[in-house]
UniProtKB/Swiss-Prot annotation:
Gene that encodes the chain: pyrR
Tree of life domain: Bacteria
UniProt function note: Regulates transcriptional attenuation of the pyrimidine nucleotide (pyr) operon by binding in a uridine-dependent manner to specific sites on pyr mRNA. This disrupts an antiterminator hairpin in the RNA and favors formation of a downstream transcription terminator, leading to a reduced expression of downstream genes. Also displays a weak uracil phosphoribosyltransferase activity which is not physiologically significant.
Subunit details: Homodimer and homohexamer; in equilibrium.
Name used for this protein in its record: Bifunctional protein PyrR
Organism: Limosilactobacillus reuteri subsp. reuteri (strain JCM 1112) (Lactobacillus reuteri)
Single Gene Ontology BP annotation: DNA-templated transcription termination
Alphabetized UniProt keyword annotations: Glycosyltransferase, RNA-binding, Transcription, Transcription regulation, Transcription termination, Transferase
Protein family (similarity comment): Belongs to the purine/pyrimidine phosphoribosyltransferase family. PyrR subfamily.
Keyword match Ribosomal protein: no
Reactions mediated catalytically: UMP + diphosphate = 5-phospho-alpha-D-ribose 1-diphosphate + uracil
Coiled-coil zones: none
Motif (PRPP-binding): 99-111
Amino acid sequence: MAHEILDGSSMQRALTRITYEIIEQNKGVDNLVFVGIKTRGVYLAKRLAKRLNQLENVEIPVAPLDVSLYRDDRHVPDHTQEPTVKTDQLDIDITNKHVILVDDVLFTGRTVRAALDALMDMGRPTRISLAVLVDRGHRELPIRPDFVGKNIPTAMNETVHVAVEEYDGHEDVTIEHN
């Protein structure tokens, strides 16, 4: 049975707090781009950009990023053909930009590592920061977020689910014991 950690209002407050932190730490919003890790990270990145626009009256570009080809923990059963890496998957130029990488949950760090590899194949940003709605710990790699909505200590046998209205039809963050 899933236990609700954040409801929709709490999620929105966490994203608003992250938005203010981004503005403060960057002393403005010049040269920023948001890159959301598919799937829910894209929707969260769009929300951050919208909130930034409301606060600073500036349109911040948002792009989705599919990291599936860069994962080191997903195995392809047919090794006879190398996957084709699409270096043009971002519809924005990240070279010399400050990229805010956005994801829903930070766990082992492997998704973020894959995203960093993908970003490096697509350009040379001046800086990359990481924003996550939930940091649940249990890192396998030396990766830490710059902006966190909520730290949720979890056990390894628990799963954190983030639901966003745009994709799931409702909003919440739940934790489930497996």
